[in-house]
Regions:
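Bacterial N-terminal signal peptides that target proteins for export
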Residues: 1-9
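Bacterial N-terminal signal peptides
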Residues: 8-18
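Sec/Tat signal peptide C-region and signal peptidase I cleavage site
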Residues: 20-24
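Gly/Pro-enriched, hydrophobic low-complexity segments
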Residues: 25, 30-58, 75, 83, ...
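Solvent-exposed N-terminal domain segments of exported/luminal and surface proteins
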Residues: 30, 34-250, 256
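Flexible, processing/modification-adjacent segments and terminal tails
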Residues: 109-188, 193, 246-248, 256-341, ...
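Short acidic/polar alpha-helix capping motifs at helix-coil junctions
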Residues: 214-216, 325, 355
Length: 453
């Protein structure tokens, strides 16, 4: 049994489950969705002192032409206070170990805390599918924590009974049915110098469609991803194709332009390094966590209030990348932190399994189920890699989205900034739903043709 205090409600919530249990939520629990809980399972009420407000539906869906600058509805907000090395101890109960480490060890690192704006909502179709899943969705009982049963187009476990279910909500976070994005991955050195790997990426998420009545309806596919490097010249034409599944391990292929050869990647998951990423990111770190859950025991610790990146309009606004990343962290004036409730999940490597990160801690936003912070530890229990993601509402989608994230490797004193879109063409978040992505792109036989264009 897990017991934790439901913050803001003033009542104790108990979740009962046995080891390996796969049961969905009860009808009584599911009935809370849309009432005291939001339609995706967050606490609707604010907290006791009002620093976290009541959820009122998030920003409404709106019209936006591709290429139009995003309008920041909270641009007039001013920081309430800042957290830095001089006062970090005062706020440590609302910070992760990784955040505290960055504040204490990176000179000038600070977190500007703004008023909390619960801006994230979803289309009605997502709410409806989430409600169905509340009493339907189940994980496998074979110890692998695969998704055994659910409908698509919604969150599977709005009322999670264990840590694995909470992480599956992150894996299936709703960001539309497919997108085309252009970005740069920046590899940053201790002296602040960096080089960028420019990439074009096509993503389809078949299980994000409300038409998917089961994993079998989409041939077990969660996501298909095609990534093409476009700069620097030494990397141009490299292609990675990956298929992420709901019930089995990932498949991946890579095209090498110099050899005009397609090679199947034997292991594109777990702690295997992403090719060309200078050993700074593992396959299951992208984005924040992805892939199979079977090497860890997952503990749902409970909820806590935490300062996390939120409503990151200023950070993702168009500007030269060199103006965003200064020294060993993104420019502080561009970052916005807010107080939100997060689910804390601890992952510990199972006995008999191996992974370079023997322990991981994830902090999952209650309103979006997105992992916003993650700490990774080595075999000696020492903090190794610290990760942070940002999010903002995409009004054309009617949902919050997350692209940019950073990962600091504390052992080599470097960090990487993933999915930096500030200097790139705009992301087409509606490309999948509106038919602007050719499904043939995601076939391994097409890789050489795409690379030879």
């Amino acid at each position: 049994m897990i017991q934790f205090r439901a913050l803001g409600l003033g009542v104790v919530v108990s979740t009962f489950f046995a080891a390996g249990a796969v049961n969905a939520a009860t009808e009584a629990d599911a009935a809370k969705l849309g009432k005291e809980l939001t339609p995706v399972g967050a606490e609707k009420a604010g907290n006791k002192d009002g620093s976290i407000p009541e959820w009122k539906g998030g920003l409404p869906k709106g019209q936006r032409k591709l290429g139009d600058a995003r309008v920041d509805p909270f641009a007039a907000d001013k920081p309430l206070f800042s957290i830095d090395a001089s006062n970090v101890e005062k706020y440590k109960d609302k910070l992760s170990a990784g955040q505290i480490e960055l504040i204490k060890t990176r000179k000038g690192y600070r977190m500007d805390v703004y008023p909390t704006q619960r801006s994230c909502g979803y289309p009605d179709s997502v709410y409806g599918q989430t409600k169905i899943n509340a009493t339907l969705a189940k994980l496998s009982n074979d110890g692998k924590d695969n998704l055994a049963q659910a409908v698509g187009g919604g969150f599977p476990f709005a009322i999670p009974g264990n840590g694995a279910e909470a992480v599956w909500n992150h894996r299936l976070r709703w960001q539309g049915e497919g997108r085309v994005e252009f970005y740069q991955t920046n590899f940053i050195n201790p002296d602040g110098s960096f080089y960028g790997l420019a990439q074009d990426q096509w993503i389809m998420t078949p299980f994000a469609s409300p038409k998917a009545k089961s994993p079998e309806d989409v041939a077990d596919v969660q996501m298909k991803l095609l990534n093409v490097a476009t700069a620097p010249a030494s990397r141009t034409g490299e292609i990675i194709l990956a298929h992420y599944f709901l019930k089995k391990s990932n498949d991946a292929w890579m095209y090498f332009p110099g050899q005009r050869r397609v090679r199947r990647l034997p292991a594109f998951e777990y702690d295997n390094p992403i090719p060309g990423y200078e050993n700074l990111e593992t396959a299951d770190q992208y984005p924040m966590f992805a892939g199979s859950l079977d090497r860890y025991d997952w503990k749902l610790v409970g909820k806590q209030e935490m300062y996390v990146p939120y409503n990151s309009f200023k950070f993702v606004a168009k500007r030269p990348v060199k103006e965003v990343y200064e020294g060993m962290y993104p420019k502080r004036d561009l970052m916005r932190y807010e107080l939100h409730r997060v689910w804390k999940v601890e992952a510990t490597v199972k006995q008999g399994m191996r992974h370079m990160f023997t322990k991981r801690t994830f902090y999952i936003d209650e309103d979006t189920w997105m992992i916003l912070n993650a700490d990774q530890y080595d075999a000696q229990g020492k903090l190794w890699r610290v990760m942070e993601a940002s999010l903002y509402p995409a009004v054309e989608l009617g949902a919050c989205v997350s692209q940019e994230f950073q990962s600091w490797d504390l052992t080599v004193n470097r960090y990487m900034a993933e999915n930096s879109t500030q200097e790139a063409k705009p992301t087409d978040w509606l490309a999948g739903a509106e038919g602007r992505i050719d499904p043939k792109r995601f076939e391994s036989d097409e890789l050489r043709r795409v690379g030879d264009r």
